[in-house]
Amino acid sequence: MVSNSFWLFILLVSFIPISAWAESRDISTLFTLRDSITEGKGFLRNWFDSETPPCSWSGITCIGHNVVAIDLSSVPLYAPFPLCIGAFQSLVRLNFSGCGFSGELPEALGNLQNLQYLDLSNNELTGPIPISLYNLKMLKEMVLDYNSLSGQLSPAIAQLQHLTKLSISMNSISGSLPPDLGSLKNLELLDIKMNTFNGSIPATFGNLSCLLHFDASQNNLTGSIFPGITSLTNLLTLDLSSNSFEGTIPREIGQLENLELLILGKNDLTGRIPQEIGSLKQLKLLHLEECQFTGKIPWSISGLSSLTELDISDNNFDAELPSSMGELGNLTQLIAKNAGLSGNMPKELGNCKKLTVINLSFNALIGPIPEEFADLEAIVSFFVEGNKLSGRVPDWIQKWKNARSIRLGQNKFSGPLPVLPLQHLLSFAAESNLLSGSIPSHICQANSLHSLLLHHNNLTGTIDEAFKGCTNLTELNLLDNHIHGEVPGYLAELPLVTLELSQNKFAGMLPAELWESKTLLEISLSNNEITGPIPESIGKLSVLQRLHIDNNLLEGPIPQSVGDLRNLTNLSLRGNRLSGIIPLALFNCRKLATLDLSYNNLTGNIPSAISHLTLLDSLILSSNQLSGSIPAEICVGFENEAHPDSEFLQHHGLLDLSYNQLTGQIPTSIKNCAMVMVLNLQGNLLNGTIPVELGELTNLTSINLSFNEFVGPMLPWSGPLVQLQGLILSNNHLDGSIPAKIGQILPKIAVLDLSSNALTGTLPQSLLCNNYLNHLDVSNNHLSGHIQFSCPDGKEYSSTLLFFNSSSNHFSGSLDESISNFTQLSTLDIHNNSLTGRLPSALSDLSSLNYLDLSSNNLYGAIPCGICNIFGLSFANFSGNYIDMYSLADCAAGGICSTNGTDHKALHPYHRVRRAITICAFTFVIIIVLVLLAVYLRRKLVRSRPLAFESASKAKATVEPTSTDELLGKKSREPLSINLATFEHALLRVTADDILKATENFSKVHIIGDGGFGTVYKAALPEGRRVAIKRLHGGHQFQGDREFLAEMETIGKVKHPNLVPLLGYCVCGDERFLIYEYMENGSLEMWLRNRADALEALGWPDRLKICLGSARGLAFLHHGFVPHIIHRDMKSSNILLDENFEPRVSDFGLARIISACETHVSTDIAGTFGYIPPEYGLTMKSTTKGDVYSFGVVMLELLTGRPPTGQEEVQGGGNLVGWVRWMIARGKQNELFDPCLPVSSVWREQMARVLAIARDCTADEPFKRPTMLEVVKGLKMTHGMECGPLVVTVSRDM
């Protein structure tokens, strides 16, 4: 405070003659200061008035001829800091706060030896604090907040012994805090928040006995809370939040009896909250959020009689809220979200009548909302989502007249919605509960309601009248209920911005009135039963940005008026019955980033007007009947970087025109598709040569041109495509040779499929030595020469190749011992060639081999002893050679390694012919028996279900394989069959009528899942048993019988507590059904995806249990029996949770048994985006190591809470694996764990160990990944917390 003498001098100044001003140096400096002003003159008008003496200028105070105070606070001068300030040697007070000064502070400030008050806050000052500033020994207040000052705080600050206020927050000052600060015994306020100070707080700070306010928040400080804190008995406020302090809260904290504000949140503090904290009678605000506190909340908290605000969120308490909290009569805010709380909400909280905010979200609270809460009439916000609360939503909630936001989502509330006559209510969320009944017509008595979230419930009825009075409603989400009727047109009269009605039973036509809305930006009506055409009036909704009407029954053409939706960025009409041509008007929607019209019946050409979509980065027109050529303008939208509003990052750069009837050549303008990453043109009638211009698309990661009519060379360009991982050119008419330098052209190729062409020449030796290649298929060509398994330089080499098929060519020569370099091979198929010589003993070294076919060659000699001992080998064929052993069945004879075995070299052709006749006769008998058995079983099944079904999806005319033989390349394989003896218990015999009744004619009400191979319905069988019925997609035998038989073979053989058991099946006509045990708690994905704005977050013990259990299930598939099973689609949505949250691996719709019964090659994508291992590209090969990668992604989901792909992971390339690597590379490992996951020190160590295993599982190179047995072993060690180095070894224990 300025002394009285100072104001006396101000009074006397008026008696000084004006003529004396001219003699003052300060006056001259004032004119210099004025002349430097270029901005803000309007705020300083009298400075430029010649009649006004300088000492009367605004903000200027003089004593005699001397300027003693300059206060230009908030005057927008926006200029470099004035250098002339140092000339005002009599200056006592200087306030330039909020003036917009920039640049560094001048050393001349040290000349102001009389300065007592300095405020330069809210400017744009840079550089260090001048050393000369520490010479201002009269200084009492130094305020430098909100600048960009840098450097360190000098120990010279100890010279400012009169300092009472030091505020340097919101800068970039770094380094450690100088202990010399502790000598400033007059200091009352110390504010250093939001800098980058590091190290610990010096113990000397305990000498600041006058300190009232201390704020060191948002720095990088470490260590424990400094021991001298208990000496600061005058302290009123203490904020140490957002640092890295460790240890416990000292019990001596209770000695700070004057403390009114204590903020220690967002640190690494551990242990219990001390009982002594209850001694702080004056405390009004207590923040302990985002630490690692454990144990119980102390009962002594009731002693905080002045407390108004308590935040203990994001901790690891394992206790109930103490009932003593009911004694906090002044409490207005209780925030304890994600704090590890359990038990019931204490009814005593109803005594805290002043409570306005209660946030207990994401805990494990149970029971109903206490009746006593009805008296909390001051409530404004009530958040309890993500618990296990049950009962009805109480009707007395209408007493909360001041309530603005109520969030009850992700609980187990049941019954109807309550009456809500709350005039101030803005937001009501009760999603993901068990609410039933219809939406009451009085819902809009809350006439201020802006947001209503009721998705994922069991609501029924219609909404014909429900929302008519909601005149302020901007967001309505009814996703996944059982609401039926038509979409009402009155919704257009509401101020809705977002309308989400997907996954209900809405039927009828789209209302023409809906498109009259002036506000709707997002509409999603997917997965309903909406019929009829898309109305012409759709074009009236010109502000619309996202429109999703996929998977309905819409028919007719796409209307021309869609072109009036000029703001549209995302349009999905996928999976309807739309016909006609793609309208030219659609291309007036020039903001489109994603356009998906796939799986319709569209015809005609792809219009050249597509060039208007310059922001397009995802175009999906697959599975239609489009014809004509690919327009030269197709690439215009792919010339630019990805649009920021693109919905799915994994779809960026996707150009998919597959499975149409396109003809002609790929246009040379394809070179302009610079941003295309995935190019799918398979399944068309394209011809000509592969354009050399493809070699200019350096961002390509995969190309699929299979099943077309291309001719000419397979690789017409010579420059490298360094990003390309998948190249699939099978089933064309390509000729010529494979370039000798293919390894340089495709340096990172992982999947290369050149099968079923007319290629000639040799197989380049360098191709097999590519460091990235793991799938190579050159079968059914005219290749010749030797297959070189050694590298050109002759050096020893460990290949990463997993799959090699060179069958049905003209290869000759022998197999040499260098094949031992290919230890990762799981499939080796060289049948139907002209190989000669003996089998190399190195074949026994291929320990990963599970499929071996060397049949129909000219090989001779003995079988290497170790062949039959390869653990995973489930199929081997040596027939058609001069070798006794034809298949693995011959291993049972046990004589192939004996010293007195047959002399295979001397085997006469006569014996070979005789043996062939014998085998053919035996095979003929077996085939007859199998055919008769199949006929018998089919007739028996058909009799049990005479009813015919309509196929789930219409068969499309494509160039895909139409039979098993065609898919397998007419290889000799065992027939697909169902071995009913493999099932442990008798299967349920379910009739078609049972299924129709249980699913109400396949009503969408019963849908609980929809995968690539089938839709899953929740149903109750006649005897009352709840089951899940999977209706397999498929309109022909390859897509129906094959998946059905594979599923039966797979699940029937598998019995494990962590796998979903198959209960029965049903066959009728083209329809195939599987009946599974119903899993009460849904999928892991459902529990992980949503948190503060969605579903409940699982605690770490639950996540670790789920991780270990699902690993055991997958390990059993890989190693539990022969033949081994590959899942092919391992993901969080395929891990189901029973009533005890025990995990069960589900959905073997993509499973393949690697045996003679089935191929392991597929032309479809195996897996789901985000889970597919990098070696797949557009994979046609599945391996156990691919499953391991996918499971590693699931582990990362459990650790981080993030989805496998999305906007959040943009730093890592749009996927979770990349983001985790990006975070770890920057030393941010502790920041990648799920922020909604409270952890103790033990849990943190467990999480770090699981992260290490997950990183091994998601290694780019398959051979670096562990087996699932090793994963189980590592997780078991982690679960038991055997401390010390983590050593993962193979264990047979699952």
UniProtKB/Swiss-Prot annotation:
Does the entry annotate any disulfide bonds, and if so which pairs? none
- Quaternary structure, from the entry: Interacts with TDL1A.
Q: SUPFAM superfamilies in the record, alphabetically?
A: L domain-like, Protein kinase-like (PK-like), RNI-like
Phenotype when the gene is knocked out: Male-sterile phenotype due to the absence of tapetum. Presence of extra microsporocytes in the developing anthers and ovules.
- Main location class: membrane
Full protein name? Leucine-rich repeat receptor protein kinase MSP1
User: Species name for this entry?
Assistant: Oryza sativa subsp. japonica (Rice)
Question: What EC number(s) does the entry state?
Answer: 2.7.11.1
Where in the cell is the protein located? Cell membrane
Positions annotated as active site in the UniProt record: D1129
Its membrane topology, per UniProt? Answer: Single-pass type I membrane protein
